[in-house]
């Protein structure tokens, strides 16, 4: 006879790691070239002037300056730009 009952099984017990997405530098904030402005999945925010886009759609500053957000075009696209200082 078994001294203990069987352990059973469960379908739970796993979780994905956090991805730390979102806006990292807000409007009016001063940033340096290379600073990450937005980490995102897909292009929720589009790159404006002086902003580069990485292969995972991360937006980053190409020059030193201040961050500015705007809604542009007939599709109401949210764009991020850097105003050089």
Swiss-Prot record:
Cellular component aspect of the GO annotation: cytosolic large ribosomal subunit
Recorded hits in InterPro entries, A to Z, give: Ribosomal_bL27, Ribosomal_bL27_CS
Give positions of region: Disordered: 1-20
Alphabetically sorted, this entry's keywords are:
Ribonucleoprotein, Ribosomal protein
**A biological process (GO) annotation for this entry?**
translation
User: What range does the record give for the signal peptide?
Assistant: none
Q: Which GO terms describe its molecular function?
A: structural constituent of ribosome
Task: Output the PROSITE patterns linked to this UniProt entry.
Answer: RIBOSOMAL_L27 (PS00831)
Mention any Pfam family matching this sequence.
Ribosomal_L27
Instruction: Please note every region of biased composition (Gly residues).
Output: 1-10
- Highest rank taxon of the organism: Bacteria
Q: Which family does it belong to?
A: Belongs to the bacterial ribosomal protein bL27 family.
Which HAMAP family does this chain map to?
Ribosomal_bL27 (MF_00539)
Q: What is this protein called?
A: Large ribosomal subunit protein bL27
> What organism is this sequence from?
Methylibium petroleiphilum (strain ATCC BAA-1232 / LMG 22953 / PM1)
């Amino acid at each position: 006879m078994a001294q203990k009952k069987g352990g059973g099984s469960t379908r739970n017990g796993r979780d994905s790691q956090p991805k730390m997405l979102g806006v990292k530098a807000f409007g009016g904030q001063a940033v340096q070239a290379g600073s990450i402005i937005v980490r995102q999945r897909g292009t929720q925010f589009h790159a404006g002037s002086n902003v580069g886009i990485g292969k995972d759609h991360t937006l980053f500053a190409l020059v030193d300056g201040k961050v500015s957000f705007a809604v542009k075009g007939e599709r109401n696209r949210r764009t991020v730009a850097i105003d050089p200082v």
